[in-house]
From Swiss-Prot:
Keyword Chloroplast set for record: yes
Protein name: ATP-dependent Clp protease proteolytic subunit
Upper lineage: Eukaryota, Viridiplantae, Chlorophyta, Nephroselmidophyceae, Nephroselmidales
Swiss-Prot/TrEMBL catalytic activity: Hydrolysis of proteins to small peptides in the presence of ATP and magnesium. alpha-casein is the usual test substrate. In the absence of ATP, only oligopeptides shorter than five residues are hydrolyzed (such as succinyl-Leu-Tyr-|-NHMec, and Leu-Tyr-Leu-|-Tyr-Trp, in which cleavage of the -Tyr-|-Leu- and -Tyr-|-Trp bonds also occurs)
Gene responsible for this protein: clpP
EC number: 3.4.21.92
GO CC, alphabetical: chloroplast stroma; endopeptidase Clp complex
Catalytic residues identified in the record: S101, H126
Length: 208
């Protein structure tokens, strides 16, 4: 039986008594964002809206986005990627579990030096897919649009990984899975996050 989203206490500024809010709402207030499901319009709009709101509230405080997603809609992924890369605010992206397809592109869109993966995470890149059905004119239009989106995705990976365009095109032709070390060498992330020594634990440490 599903338990739903847990609720946790949170005291609003100026309030004497805490209120019970859902876990993700509480974490958003701490500038911790989660992409924990397939990326569609609803999740994309939520993430983009939260990032824009938090940027407007205080652009000097960084955001942290935890990613455990199989990917999803190309346009939804590009929306989150664009917001993360164009805002004048540090966005740390962290792969927890898997960042596949468009989720791997969002992962790569974190601020330079702040794109991380946990030790046993997996990343996967491949080219956008389209389901061409219907009349011939519709199929041709969709094929053209898929090619356009594919070129955009290739350009984004080239910019974020510094791999050659030829390398990216070849690698996107199949499901290319990577370990954190491989993703770091590829340029998809900057470092692998490791827990610090227990006695001195303050969060995650990194090695490059």
């Amino acid at each position: 039986m599903p338990v739903g989203v847990p609720k946790v206490p949170y005291r609003l500024p100026g309030e004497s008594a805490p209120q019970w809010v859902d876990l993700y709402n509480r974490l958003y207030r701490q500038r911790l964002l989660f992409m924990g499901q397939e990326l569609g319009d609803e999740l994309s709009n939520q993430l983009c809206g939260i990032m824009i709101y938090l940027f407007a509230e205080d652009p000097s405080i960084p955001l942290f986005m935890y990613i455990n997603s199989p990917g999803g809609s190309v346009t939804s992924g590009l929306g989150v990627f664009d917001i993360a890369t164009v805002m004048m605010q540090d966005v740390t992206t962290i792969c927890v579990g898997i960042a596949a397809s468009m989720a791997s592109l969002v992962l790569s869109g974190g601020s330079t030096g702040q794109r991380l993966a946990l030790p046993h995470a997996r990343m996967m890149i491949h080219q956008p897919e389209g389901g061409s059905r219907g009349q011939a004119s519709d199929v041709m239009y969709e094929s053209s649009e898929v090619e356009r989106l594919r070129d955009i995705v290739v350009d984004c990976y080239v910019e974020r990984t510094h791999q050659s365009r030829e390398t990216i095109i070849i690698d996107l032709n199949r499901d290319l899975f990577m370990s954190p070390r491989q993703a770091r060498s590829y340029g998809l992330i900057d470092a692998v996050a490791l827990p610090a020594v227990k006695e001195e634990y303050t969060g995650f440490s990194m090695f490059s």
